[in-house]
Amino acid sequence: MFDRAPFVHGPVEAQNRIYRNHGNAPLLALLDDEPRKVLDVGCGAGDNAGLIKARYPRCEIHGITYSAAEAEIAKQWMSACWVFDIEKEIPGQLSAVKFDAVIFSHVLEHLRDPAAILNKFAHLVPRDGCVIIAVPNTLSWAMRWQFLRGNFEYRPDGVLDDTHLRLFTFVTADRYLLAKSPKLKLVSKSVTGSVPLWWLRRYLLPKTWSRYIDGLGCRVWPNLFGDQVLIKAVAASLDTVS
Protein backbone atom coordinates (compact mmCIF):
# COMPACT_ATOMS: atom_id res chain seq x y z
CA MET A 1 0.00 0.00 0.00
CA PHE A 2 0.96 3.65 -0.40
CA ASP A 3 -0.04 5.13 2.94
CA ARG A 4 0.77 8.74 3.72
CA ALA A 5 1.22 10.71 6.91
CA PRO A 6 -1.49 13.23 7.82
CA PHE A 7 -1.11 16.84 6.73
CA VAL A 8 -3.36 18.42 9.30
CA HIS A 9 -3.40 18.50 13.07
CA GLY A 10 -0.45 16.10 13.24
CA PRO A 11 1.86 15.97 16.23
CA VAL A 12 5.13 17.85 16.22
CA GLU A 13 6.99 14.63 15.43
CA ALA A 14 5.06 14.41 12.13
CA GLN A 15 7.06 17.42 10.98
CA ASN A 16 10.26 15.39 11.40
CA ARG A 17 9.11 11.96 10.24
CA ILE A 18 10.44 10.35 7.06
CA TYR A 19 8.03 8.39 4.89
CA ARG A 20 9.50 6.07 2.25
CA ASN A 21 8.08 3.65 -0.29
CA HIS A 22 8.93 2.52 -3.81
CA GLY A 23 6.82 5.18 -5.50
CA ASN A 24 3.52 4.63 -7.25
CA ALA A 25 4.54 3.49 -10.73
CA PRO A 26 0.99 2.61 -11.95
CA LEU A 27 -0.16 6.14 -11.13
CA LEU A 28 2.87 7.79 -12.73
CA ALA A 29 2.17 5.81 -15.92
CA LEU A 30 -0.80 8.16 -16.39
CA LEU A 31 1.51 11.14 -16.92
CA ASP A 32 1.55 12.55 -20.43
CA ASP A 33 4.74 11.98 -22.37
CA GLU A 34 7.58 14.33 -21.48
CA PRO A 35 5.96 16.55 -18.83
CA ARG A 36 8.05 19.66 -18.37
CA LYS A 37 6.98 20.62 -14.86
CA VAL A 38 5.28 18.42 -12.24
CA LEU A 39 4.03 19.05 -8.70
CA ASP A 40 3.85 16.09 -6.29
CA VAL A 41 1.50 17.00 -3.45
CA GLY A 42 2.43 14.88 -0.45
CA CYS A 43 5.76 13.92 -1.94
CA GLY A 44 7.17 12.14 1.12
CA ALA A 45 10.91 11.65 0.74
CA GLY A 46 10.70 11.91 -3.05
CA ASP A 47 10.11 8.31 -4.13
CA ASN A 48 7.71 9.33 -6.92
CA ALA A 49 10.11 12.07 -7.96
CA GLY A 50 12.90 9.50 -8.29
CA LEU A 51 10.76 7.42 -10.66
CA ILE A 52 9.81 10.48 -12.70
CA LYS A 53 13.42 11.61 -13.03
CA ALA A 54 14.48 8.14 -14.14
CA ARG A 55 11.93 8.24 -16.95
CA TYR A 56 11.96 11.98 -17.75
CA PRO A 57 15.41 13.35 -16.82
CA ARG A 58 14.58 16.86 -18.06
CA CYS A 59 11.37 17.16 -16.05
CA GLU A 60 11.33 19.90 -13.41
CA ILE A 61 9.76 18.46 -10.25
CA HIS A 62 8.34 20.38 -7.31
CA GLY A 63 7.04 18.73 -4.15
CA ILE A 64 5.02 19.51 -1.04
CA THR A 65 5.38 17.73 2.29
CA TYR A 66 4.55 18.40 5.92
CA SER A 67 7.92 17.06 7.07
CA ALA A 68 11.09 19.14 6.87
CA ALA A 69 13.11 15.94 7.22
CA GLU A 70 11.42 14.46 4.15
CA ALA A 71 11.97 17.66 2.20
CA GLU A 72 15.73 17.50 2.76
CA ILE A 73 15.84 14.03 1.19
CA ALA A 74 13.38 14.79 -1.61
CA LYS A 75 15.37 17.80 -2.82
CA GLN A 76 17.90 15.51 -4.48
CA TRP A 77 15.32 14.89 -7.23
CA MET A 78 13.47 18.18 -7.07
CA SER A 79 13.92 21.76 -8.14
CA ALA A 80 11.97 22.83 -5.05
CA CYS A 81 10.31 21.12 -2.10
CA TRP A 82 7.79 23.13 -0.10
CA VAL A 83 7.01 22.42 3.56
CA PHE A 84 3.52 23.54 4.59
CA ASP A 85 0.04 22.33 5.52
CA ILE A 86 -1.94 21.93 2.29
CA GLU A 87 -5.22 22.67 4.06
CA LYS A 88 -3.96 26.22 4.52
CA GLU A 89 -3.31 28.79 1.82
CA ILE A 90 -0.85 27.97 -0.96
CA PRO A 91 2.23 30.21 -0.59
CA GLY A 92 2.15 33.08 -3.04
CA GLN A 93 5.38 32.12 -4.76
CA LEU A 94 4.05 28.63 -5.47
CA SER A 95 0.56 29.78 -6.48
CA ALA A 96 2.10 31.75 -9.34
CA VAL A 97 3.61 28.61 -10.91
CA LYS A 98 1.82 26.48 -13.53
CA PHE A 99 2.40 22.73 -13.79
CA ASP A 100 1.81 20.26 -16.62
CA ALA A 101 0.71 17.74 -14.01
CA VAL A 102 -0.21 17.70 -10.33
CA ILE A 103 0.06 14.39 -8.46
CA PHE A 104 -1.96 13.29 -5.42
CA SER A 105 -0.75 9.81 -4.48
CA HIS A 106 -2.62 8.55 -1.41
CA VAL A 107 -2.96 12.00 0.11
CA LEU A 108 -6.57 13.11 -0.32
CA GLU A 109 -8.00 10.51 2.05
CA HIS A 110 -6.14 12.24 4.89
CA LEU A 111 -7.94 15.57 4.42
CA ARG A 112 -11.13 17.01 5.88
CA ASP A 113 -12.38 18.40 2.55
CA PRO A 114 -10.31 16.75 -0.19
CA ALA A 115 -12.57 17.98 -3.00
CA ALA A 116 -11.96 21.60 -1.99
CA ILE A 117 -8.21 21.04 -1.74
CA LEU A 118 -8.18 19.42 -5.17
CA ASN A 119 -10.00 22.41 -6.66
CA LYS A 120 -7.49 24.78 -5.04
CA PHE A 121 -4.57 22.99 -6.68
CA ALA A 122 -6.42 22.60 -9.99
CA HIS A 123 -5.84 26.32 -10.52
CA LEU A 124 -2.12 25.56 -10.85
CA VAL A 125 -2.81 23.46 -13.96
CA PRO A 126 -3.15 25.21 -17.34
CA ARG A 127 -5.58 24.08 -20.02
CA ASP A 128 -4.81 20.50 -21.17
CA GLY A 129 -2.63 19.90 -18.12
CA CYS A 130 -3.63 17.01 -15.90
CA VAL A 131 -4.22 15.97 -12.31
CA ILE A 132 -3.57 12.34 -11.41
CA ILE A 133 -4.92 10.83 -8.21
CA ALA A 134 -4.57 7.59 -6.27
CA VAL A 135 -6.80 6.71 -3.32
CA PRO A 136 -7.42 3.37 -1.58
CA ASN A 137 -10.54 1.35 -2.43
CA THR A 138 -12.50 0.67 0.75
CA LEU A 139 -14.57 -2.09 -0.90
CA SER A 140 -11.82 -4.37 -2.19
CA TRP A 141 -12.38 -8.08 -1.62
CA ALA A 142 -9.93 -8.08 1.30
CA MET A 143 -11.83 -5.28 3.06
CA ARG A 144 -15.20 -6.91 2.36
CA TRP A 145 -13.94 -10.09 3.99
CA GLN A 146 -12.97 -8.11 7.07
CA PHE A 147 -16.35 -6.38 7.17
CA LEU A 148 -18.16 -9.72 6.74
CA ARG A 149 -16.30 -11.01 9.79
CA GLY A 150 -17.43 -7.96 11.73
CA ASN A 151 -14.03 -6.27 11.73
CA PHE A 152 -13.83 -2.48 11.36
CA GLU A 153 -10.85 -1.26 13.33
CA TYR A 154 -8.50 1.60 12.61
CA ARG A 155 -4.84 0.65 12.26
CA PRO A 156 -1.45 2.34 11.86
CA ASP A 157 -1.55 1.72 8.10
CA GLY A 158 -3.66 0.26 5.29
CA VAL A 159 -7.13 1.24 4.10
CA LEU A 160 -8.31 1.86 7.67
CA ASP A 161 -5.25 3.91 8.56
CA ASP A 162 -6.09 5.86 11.69
CA THR A 163 -5.22 9.11 9.90
CA HIS A 164 -7.73 8.54 7.07
CA LEU A 165 -10.60 11.00 7.28
CA ARG A 166 -12.36 10.00 4.03
CA LEU A 167 -13.16 6.59 2.54
CA PHE A 168 -13.53 6.00 -1.21
CA THR A 169 -14.57 3.24 -3.59
CA PHE A 170 -14.11 2.79 -7.33
CA VAL A 171 -17.70 3.94 -7.83
CA THR A 172 -17.58 7.05 -5.65
CA ALA A 173 -14.00 8.36 -5.81
CA ASP A 174 -14.16 10.51 -8.95
CA ARG A 175 -17.73 11.66 -8.29
CA TYR A 176 -16.80 12.98 -4.86
CA LEU A 177 -13.30 14.28 -5.53
CA LEU A 178 -14.12 16.18 -8.74
CA ALA A 179 -17.42 17.59 -7.48
CA LYS A 180 -15.90 20.98 -6.58
CA SER A 181 -13.55 21.23 -9.57
CA PRO A 182 -15.56 22.38 -12.62
CA LYS A 183 -12.27 22.98 -14.42
CA LEU A 184 -11.33 19.29 -14.32
CA LYS A 185 -12.78 16.72 -16.72
CA LEU A 186 -12.42 13.01 -15.98
CA VAL A 187 -10.57 11.18 -18.74
CA SER A 188 -9.77 7.84 -17.11
CA LYS A 189 -10.49 5.78 -14.02
CA SER A 190 -8.93 2.40 -13.27
CA VAL A 191 -7.59 0.25 -10.45
CA THR A 192 -4.61 -1.86 -9.55
CA GLY A 193 -5.06 -4.92 -7.38
CA SER A 194 -5.22 -8.68 -7.40
CA VAL A 195 -7.56 -11.67 -7.50
CA PRO A 196 -7.28 -13.94 -4.43
CA LEU A 197 -5.59 -16.96 -6.02
CA TRP A 198 -3.76 -17.93 -2.83
CA TRP A 199 -1.85 -21.24 -3.21
CA LEU A 200 -2.58 -21.34 -6.96
CA ARG A 201 -0.51 -18.20 -7.39
CA ARG A 202 2.31 -19.45 -5.19
CA TYR A 203 2.65 -23.04 -6.35
CA LEU A 204 0.82 -23.69 -9.62
CA LEU A 205 0.12 -20.77 -11.95
CA PRO A 206 2.88 -19.20 -14.04
CA LYS A 207 3.42 -15.52 -13.25
CA THR A 208 2.10 -14.51 -16.65
CA TRP A 209 -1.20 -16.31 -15.94
CA SER A 210 -1.47 -14.72 -12.51
CA ARG A 211 -0.88 -11.26 -13.98
CA TYR A 212 -3.47 -11.92 -16.69
CA ILE A 213 -6.09 -13.04 -14.16
CA ASP A 214 -5.33 -10.04 -11.93
CA GLY A 215 -5.67 -7.67 -14.89
CA LEU A 216 -8.90 -9.27 -16.07
CA GLY A 217 -10.40 -9.17 -12.59
CA CYS A 218 -9.48 -5.51 -12.15
CA ARG A 219 -11.00 -4.57 -15.51
CA VAL A 220 -14.26 -6.50 -15.11
CA TRP A 221 -14.84 -6.07 -11.35
CA PRO A 222 -12.75 -3.02 -10.37
CA ASN A 223 -14.68 -2.31 -7.18
CA LEU A 224 -14.08 -5.87 -5.96
CA PHE A 225 -10.48 -6.58 -6.94
CA GLY A 226 -9.00 -3.07 -6.99
CA ASP A 227 -6.77 -2.05 -4.07
CA GLN A 228 -6.21 1.50 -5.26
CA VAL A 229 -8.29 3.72 -7.54
CA LEU A 230 -6.37 5.69 -10.18
CA ILE A 231 -7.97 8.82 -11.62
CA LYS A 232 -6.79 11.14 -14.37
CA ALA A 233 -8.52 14.46 -15.01
CA VAL A 234 -7.60 17.09 -17.57
CA ALA A 235 -8.00 20.83 -17.12
CA ALA A 236 -10.37 22.60 -19.48
CA SER A 237 -11.17 26.29 -19.70
CA LEU A 238 -14.25 27.09 -17.65
CA ASP A 239 -16.16 28.48 -20.65
CA THR A 240 -15.96 25.04 -22.33
CA VAL A 241 -17.27 23.11 -19.32
CA SER A 242 -20.90 22.15 -19.76
PLM feature spans:
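S-adenosyl-L-methionine-dependent methyltransferase catalytic module, highlighting the catalytic core
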Residues: P11-R17, H22, D47, I86, ...
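Short beta->alpha junction loops/turns
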Residues: S67, V107-H110, T138
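Small/polar loops that bind or transfer phosphate-bearing groups
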Residues: D40, E109, I133
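Active-site flanking residues adjacent to catalytic metal/cofactor-binding acidic residues
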Residues: L39, S105, P136
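A short beta-strand submotif of the Rossmann-like class I SAM-dependent methyltransferase core
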Residues: A101-V107
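Conserved N-terminal segment of class I S-adenosyl-L-methionine
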Residues: M1-V97, A101, A115-L118, K189-S194, ...
